[in-house]
Amino acid sequence: MKKGRGLALLLAGAILPALSGCLLPPDAPSVLASAGGTGPDDAYVVYSVEQEYEVLRLLGLRPERQSLHIIDGRAFDVIIATNPETGEARDVWFDISRFFGRL
């Protein structure tokens, strides 16, 4: 085995297990498929404000108003959003506990 290849394998063996604990947040389509966003027990779990707006975009909704709710120690954004084609408004719940209040 070449010296450089052995070093690469050694480094990979040390780095890959360490990185296995680093999980990326799910993408917006995965978030969308995981819940319905109809209330605190069915809220979309998101990892950023940008992800909230990406979910709204995928739903075809336009945000109108937003409010913060703290329920049982969990933080939720409730966005009243409108379907631009029908004018129908609905509340969309997002669980923002994973990033709310963190720098």
Language model features with spans:
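Solvent-exposed, low-complexity, repeat-rich "mucin-like" stalks and linkers
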Residues: 33-52
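Short, compact, well-ordered microdomains
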Residues: 68-103
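Bacterial N-terminal signal peptides that target proteins for export
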Residues: 1-10
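Intrinsically disordered, low-complexity, charge-dense segments enriched in Lys/Arg
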Residues: 27-30
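C-terminal motif of bacterial Sec signal peptides marking the signal peptidase cleavage site
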Residues: 18-21
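Bacterial signal peptide processing site
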Residues: 23-25
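Charged, amphipathic alpha-helical segments
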Residues: 57-67
